[in-house]
From Swiss-Prot:
PANTHER family: RING BOX. The gene is apc-11. This is Anaphase-promoting complex subunit 11. Changing C100L: Loss of ubiquitination activity. Belongs to the RING-box family. The keyword Zinc-finger applies. Pfam families: zf-ANAPC11. Probable component of the anaphase promoting complex/cyclosome (APC/C), a cell cycle-regulated E3 ubiquitin ligase that controls progression through mitosis and the G1 phase of the cell cycle. The APC/C complex acts by mediating ubiquitination and subsequent degradation of target proteins. Developmental role in early embryogenesis and the metaphase to anaphase transition in meiosis and mitosis. In vitro, recruits the ubiquitin-conjugating enzyme ubc-2 to exert ubiquitin ligase activity.
Length: 135
């Protein structure tokens, strides 16, 4: 037995300039076929539906605006201190900023990009955008 769904449809006859309102009765299979054929159509019904979300996948995005974090995204050492490859902080361990606005120690990002992997590593390790240093 197919469930009958009442639907109000308002037709706009532009040649006559008046609105006619009529009731249509459609079976649920006809309704689904119509919605499949015309996915942009929203039909008003009095049917309420209850759903349960069993799984939810969430994705977030963030970026440093001015290299504003205090630590390197690779070695997690403070920018004020030296990276793992340097003995002393300063000009020998410069901070570099990518076009994605993520900041790293120069030695850390150079080592990251040069590391052998199956995939190209000329990408920011935090956001995977192509890595280019802001000059």
């Amino acid at each position: 037995m197919e469930q009958q769904i009442q639907m109000d449809e308002q037709e706009n006859d532009e040649s006559q300039g008046n609105d006619d309102q009529q009731n249509m009765s459609m079976s649920s299979s006809e309704l689904h076929t119509m919605q499949d054929d015309h996915p942009g159509i929203l039909l008003k019904t009095n049917t309420r539906m209850s759903i349960t979300v069993k799984k939810l996948h969430v994705c977030g995005e963030w970026k440093w605006l001015q290299g504003g974090e205090d630590t390197c995204g690779i070695c997690r050492m403070e920018f004020e201190s030296a990276c793992n490859m340097c003995k002393f902080p300063g000009d020998d361990c410069p901070l570099v900023l990518g076009i994605c606005r993520h900041a790293f120690h120069r030695h850390c990002i150079d080592k990251w990009i040069a590391a052998p992997t199956n995939q190209p590593r000329a990408q920011c390790p935090l956001c995977r955008q192509d890595w280019t240093i802001v000059e």
